[in-house]
Each structure stands twice: as C-alpha cells, then as structure tokens.
C-alpha cells in the first residue's frame, strides 16, 4: 500500500470531534514499515529500543464522580509493528475525562490493554499521582553539548552527506538541543534534544551539528527521525551506537524515542523544555 493511502485514514490534520466517553477506537496505528523500508530497515532490526511517551493531561472520574488526575508514562517497544499516532493517542486519553472507573489500577490496566492492541505488542503503562512527582529535578543529557560552535549553517533540508568523521576512533557521548523537524501530516514543528553515544570513527562535531540542523525542514514522525539518524550514523562505521531524542510536548504528550545496539534506555526525568 502506498504511504499516502496508508496515512489517509488518520485523524491528524483533520477536524475531529472530541469524545465524551471512554473510546478505545480513537487509537490509530501507523505501520512502522512505511518509513523503515526506505532507510534500509528490514524485519530484523539492527537495534533495540522503546518509544517513551509522557502524558500530562490525564483525568477520569472515580466511582463517586470525583475527578482524578495523573501523569502517565508509556513504553512502546521499537519492535512493535505499529507506532501510535499522536493525535489519536490524545483523543483516546481525553475519552477518559467524563467516564467513571473504580480504581487507578483498573485505568492503568485498561490503558495497557488498549495501547498494546494498537501497537501490536505489549505496552507498559505507569500512572503517577502528582504528589509522587513534586520536587522532581529537570534532567539533561550526559556528555558534551555540541551547540556552542562558531560555524556557518546554510542547509536546512535533510542532507546526510554533511556528516564527516576523523581518522581515529573514540567512544564519546554528545548531545544537541537544536533538533527541529516537522510533522509528516500537518507540517507543525517538532522541537527536540538528541543524545548520541557511540564507539567508532570520531565524529566531526561541526559536521554533526550541521547535519542535525538539516532536519529543520524535514517532514517525518519523531520515531522515524530518530531511526533515520541512527541509520545515517551507523553507515559511518560505528561499532556501538545509541540515538535518543526527547521532544517537547504537544497536546499534553511528549514522545521520546530511544534506539541502541548496546545499552538499555536511559532512565531520566523530563528536560527543561518538556
């Protein structure tokens, strides 16, 4: 099926009525294969990973009709056949607003069941009360920030040929807060920070920054941008590689895709812009 036809059914970019009662049918899957095949990703993935979502606008009614509020943490495995389209995720969460449920545990279990069905593989959900999060510090990525460089930038359309390496090998962790791409459907800007931990040919930092900035006019979902960056860097001969992006929230949700061929996902709180 052509990519356009596969995406035509999505509520993203279309006028949508907000549901007033719990409705799992709001969730819409997007096959990951649509954007994996063009960048050389087959069924056997060269990485493991997870899409870590945070939901800040979650509410429902308890058995007595009293509103409950929570922050939700959702982990969608990168191995799932589908990613979850973000607007449909928002509409799904909003469908809880005026529906009654007996316990927090039941709501969490219900979300796990529905999201797992959409993704095509088990999804983990954790709902936290606000009291559990008060006083949490704002996190930052480890390693060296490459943003403060006195360089000229002229490419704002995706250009992997900008990447360059030096002759010797190293292991290092780098990050940038200058990642910006655009929604595949609506063209709305997606702002993010990206972390790169690698062992292999030393990356030219000026070239890496120019490459990341070249996503500025690129249209792709968050998860797909991270996998594209992973593939481009892996093609340089990296022996070990992690790419992890944390995006600013939209519609009460942020998306934080993690991909690595050698380490588990970093455990960290939200960043300054989240």
From Swiss-Prot:
EC number: 1.7.1.13
Spans annotated as Disordered: 1-33
Keywords assigned by UniProt, alphabetized: Cytoplasm, NADP, Oxidoreductase, Queuosine biosynthesis
InterPro entries membership: GTP-CH-I_C/QueF, NADPH_dep_7-cyano-7-deazaG_red, QueF, QueF_N, QueF_type2
Subcellular location: Cytoplasm
GO biological process, one term: queuosine biosynthetic process
Binding, substrate: 84-86, 222-223
Primary location: cytoplasm
Reactions catalysed according to its record: 7-aminomethyl-7-carbaguanine + 2 NADP(+) = 7-cyano-7-deazaguanine + 2 NADPH + 3 H(+)
Chain positions recorded as NADPH binding sites: 86-87, 250-251
Pathway assigned to this chain's UniProt record: tRNA modification; tRNA-queuosine biosynthesis
Similarity field: Belongs to the GTP cyclohydrolase I family. QueF type 2 subfamily.
Protein name: NADPH-dependent 7-cyano-7-deazaguanine reductase
Species of provenance: Idiomarina loihiensis (strain ATCC BAA-735 / DSM 15497 / L2-TR)
Annotated gene: queF
């Amino acid at each position: 099926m052509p990519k356009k036809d596969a995406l035509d059914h999505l509520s993203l970019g279309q006028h949508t009525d907000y549901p007033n009662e719990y409705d799992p049918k709001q969730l819409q899957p997007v096959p990951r294969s649509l954007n994996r095949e063009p960048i050389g990703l087959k069924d056997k993935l060269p990485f493991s990973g997870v899409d870590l979502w945070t939901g800040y606008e979650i509410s429902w009614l308890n058995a007595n009709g009293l509103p409950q509020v929570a922050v939700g943490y959702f982990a969608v495995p990168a191995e799932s056949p589908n990613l979850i389209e973000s607007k449909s995720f928002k509409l799904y969460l909003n469908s809880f607003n005026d529906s009654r449920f007996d316990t927090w545990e039941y709501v969490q279990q219900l979300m796990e069941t529905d999201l797992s069905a959409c993704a095509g593989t088990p999804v983990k959900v954790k709902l936290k009360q606000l009291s559990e999060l008060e006083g949490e510090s704002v996190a930052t990525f480890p390693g060296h920030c490459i943003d403060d460089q006195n360089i000229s930038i002229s490419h704002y359309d995706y250009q992997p040929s900008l990447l360059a390496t030096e002759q010797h090998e190293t292991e290092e962790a780098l990050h940038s807060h200058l990642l910006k791409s655009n929604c595949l459907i609506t063209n709305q800007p997606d702002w993010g920070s990206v972390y790169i931990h690698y062992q292999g040919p030393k990356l030219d930092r000026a070239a890496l920054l120019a490459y990341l900035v070249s996503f500025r006019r690129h249209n792709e979902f968050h998860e797909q941008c991270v996998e594209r960056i992973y593939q481009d860097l892996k093609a340089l001969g990296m022996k070990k590689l992690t790419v992890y992006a944390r995006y600013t929230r939209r519609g009460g949700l942020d998306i934080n895709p993690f991909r690595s061929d050698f380490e588990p996902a970093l455990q960290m709180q939200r960043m300054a812009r989240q």
